[in-house]
């Protein structure tokens, strides 16, 4: 399976946003804004696409499929794109708090640590439906890394996800609105790039 191999902190600094949430990621990032000439429209569109791909850890071929699917939606294309990505299983494992990064969440899914409605799903791109429960397998609940992630992130709540801390479960209760999705990107620029 293809992976995004660029060092995480270097990627965050290059894109000008803290993709992975680590406090050290943006060290020396201030120089980015003052470097070089004013960016062209194409440059801005390309940068925004790279941000979205980095946030969700999606490769180009797969990302293009998401864009094409979003373009067929009745919703605003940019909003539809982010909603599709937000409902990926690996992303929801991260949003629920089982993992401290998208990379760790994808690894957990690949290794069979996650159940959806009681059944193992090991496909990171699986599209979680409204009402489906995402659960950490029993035998991994005593793993300090996973349990600490889940309990330490109690303060990070999203209105479209319901958490059950006693049972290590999260549920997608509705599709999120764009303003609720916690990523800093210009999705309109991304759509413009693929509309040419």
Swiss-Prot record:
Residues 87-148 form the S4 RNA-binding domain. One of its GO terms (biological process) is translation. It comes from Clostridium novyi (strain NT). One of its GO terms (molecular function) is structural constituent of ribosome. Belongs to the universal ribosomal protein uS4 family. GO terms for cellular component: small ribosomal subunit. The gene is rpsD2. PROSITE patterns: RIBOSOMAL_S4 (PS00632), S4 (PS50889). This is Small ribosomal subunit protein uS4B. SUPFAM superfamilies: Alpha-L RNA-binding motif. InterPro entries: Ribosomal_uS4, Ribosomal_uS4_bac-type, Ribosomal_uS4_CS, Ribosomal_uS4_N, S4_RNA-bd, S4_RNA-bd_sf. Keywords: Ribonucleoprotein, Ribosomal protein, RNA-binding, rRNA-binding.
């Amino acid at each position: 399976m293809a992976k995004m191999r660029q060092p995480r902190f270097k990627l965050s600094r290059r894109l000008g946003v803290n993709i992975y949430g680590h406090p050290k990621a943006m060290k020396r990032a201030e120089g980015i804004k003052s470097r070089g000439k004013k960016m062209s429209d194409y440059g801005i569109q390309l940068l925004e696409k790279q941000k979205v791909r980095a946030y969700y850890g999606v490769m180009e071929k797969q990302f293009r499929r998401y864009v094409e699917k979003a373009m067929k939606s009745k919703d605003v294309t940019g909003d539809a794109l982010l909603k599709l990505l937000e409902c990926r299983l690996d992303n929801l494992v991260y949003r629920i708090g089982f993992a401290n990064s998208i990379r760790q969440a994808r690894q957990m899914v690949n290794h069979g640590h996650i159940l959806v409605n009681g059944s193992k799903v090991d496909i990171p791109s699986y599209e979680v439906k409204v009402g489906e429960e995402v659960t950490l397998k029993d035998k991994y609940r005593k793993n300090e890394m996973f349990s600490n992630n889940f309990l330490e992130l109690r303060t990070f709540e999203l209105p479209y996800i319901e958490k059950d801390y006693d049972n290590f479960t999260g549920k997608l209760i509705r599709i999120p609105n764009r303003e609720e999705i916690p990523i800093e990107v210009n999705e309109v620029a991304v759509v413009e790039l693929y509309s040419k």
